[in-house]
Amino acid sequence: MYCTHLMTLQLVVMAMLWVTPVRAGTECRYGCRLNNMTIIVEREDCHGSITITTCAGLCETTDLNYQSTWLPRSQGVCNFKEWSYEKVYLEGCPSGVEPFFIPVAKSCDCIKCKTDNTDCDRISMATPSCIVNPLEM
């Protein structure tokens, strides 16, 4: 009788271990996805803020501990898969002011970094920057 209860308990625990990662994965998604972002836009005659749809999130990647000339390095980045320009008028602009044309993401994907439209450089400790560790403030 004791062995039967023990086996039943083991089966229940195993079933819970199989279900838990699936459930956690649906609630804890930090992957590449569409995201609304508010940005400040200025021009001489008017200014304001607009909300656009862009891509944000983490991409699974592998970074080797050594550099090799035989293995190409490819960093996956969250970027637009499909996008279009949308015409945006700011509130408070005088009539007749030309609209802004803003790129708006329609879908996102983790893709190889394209240097023609994305900053793909790595941050190195030797690179002068204004990035400050919050713990040092």
UniProtKB/Swiss-Prot annotation:
It is found in: Secreted. GO terms for cellular component: cytoplasm; extracellular space. Keywords: Disulfide bond, Glycoprotein, Hormone, Secreted, Signal. Gene3D superfamilies: Cystine-knot cytokines. GO terms for biological process: G protein-coupled receptor signaling pathway; ovulation. Its main location: secreted. InterPro entries: Cystine-knot_cytokine (IPR029034), Glyco_hormone_CN (IPR006208), Gonadotropin_bsu (IPR001545), Gonadotropin_bsu_CS (IPR018245). CDD domains: GHB_like. Belongs to the glycoprotein hormones subunit beta family. Involved in gametogenesis and steroidogenesis. Heterodimer of an alpha and a beta chain. This is Gonadotropin subunit beta-1. It comes from Oncorhynchus keta (Chum salmon). The gene is cgba.
